[in-house]
Amino acid sequence: MTRALPIPLTFASFADVEALLRTFETTPCDEPGLTELDHGLQCAEALRKMAPDDVGLQVAGLLHDVAHGACHIDAHHEVGADALEPLFGSRIAQLVRLHVDAKRYLVATRPAYRARLSPISMQSLMAQGGAMSDDEVAGFEARPWWREGLRLRVADEAAKVIGQPTSGLDHWLPLVRSVCAGPGGARA
């Protein structure tokens, strides 16, 4: 589970994001039996069910672990958000950034949530600071899009089912393109 220290991760265009997602088809996920793409697709699908009209949230779900492999697991949300923001804007970047703290928030505010965590998530929770303090909870609730960040986190935890059918990457790429403001994106 431990990875190297953060290295720069940048995307110059939609094509760069697509290329990385395609490598995730064969990149093992920390969750046994899944690839990084399996996990991202399951997360996006769960968010499509929770928030069918929020394509940005769904895309954030697909991309939330984009920095896995590029940095230490504890920093992947920051590295990923920083890499995505130039192409996808502040909302999608913030949602990616929030997904780690959202786990800490949910464990602090909903005690039953801890029981839903996989062993890998429990291990990373401890490395990421454990349950939030009351002050951290208040700070989290002051951040933009924090409620959507909770949805992303719930979907993230649910997206760990070996063999779960999902729409494939080719289904999701036009949606990713539709919210991309960089070269090759629909909002460019």
Name each model-derived stretch.
Residues 1-188:
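Metal-dependent phosphohydrolase cores
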